[in-house]
């Protein structure tokens, strides 16, 4: 472990450990998509955004208690896992993909934490990595590998040899 450099500076660590604020909760609520599928609570984020002036104080207190004190209501962690079709009129299980439908409270907590992490992630994750970065997906690497193999196969058929790779 001594040979692995520490990438999280004292300043980053202090920023991550700061007490979460009402402003962070407000920002998260209004950054999120209002019409995403609801979880077991049955509530769309649209409800929270529309009635935030009425319910914002109480919801924020609950979220801040969770984030700052670690008191996370058990029911907030309930999630539905369901299958959604990948194609029109699927006939095989493989033509579905699973998604998790989380409670809105859980989604807001996650967004507040994600916003806090966004400030330091570029310092911790290489730009060449395709996961955990905005506008990138881990599946991008699969496409690059497929295209590389396809190109190599075509080169082999033309008897031009293979490119060299360095690992």
Which positions does each model-derived feature cover?
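Conserved catalytic palm subdomain of right-hand nucleotidyl-transferase polymerases, strongest
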Residues: 36-43, 92-101, 142-167
């Amino acid at each position: 472990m001594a040979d692995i450099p520490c990438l999280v500076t004292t300043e980053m660590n202090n920023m991550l450990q700061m007490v979460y604020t009402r402003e962070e909760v407000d920002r998260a609520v209004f950054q999120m998509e209002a019409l995403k599928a609801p979880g077991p609570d049955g509530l769309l984020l649209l409800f929270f955004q529309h009635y935030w002036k009425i319910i914002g104080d109480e919801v924020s207190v609950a979220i801040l208690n969770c984030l700052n004190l670690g008191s996370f209501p058990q029911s907030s962690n309930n999630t539905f896992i369901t299958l959604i079709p990948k194609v029109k009129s699927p006939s095989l299980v493989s033509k579905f993909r699973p998604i998790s439908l989380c409670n809105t409270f859980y989604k807001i907590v996650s967004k507040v934490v994600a916003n806090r992490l966004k400030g330091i992630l570029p310092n911790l994750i290489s730009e060449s990595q395709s996961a955990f970065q905005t506008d990138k997906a881990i599946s991008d690497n699969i496409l690059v590998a497929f295209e590389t193999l396809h190109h190599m196969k075509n080169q082999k058929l033309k008897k031009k040899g293979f490119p060299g790779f360095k690992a």
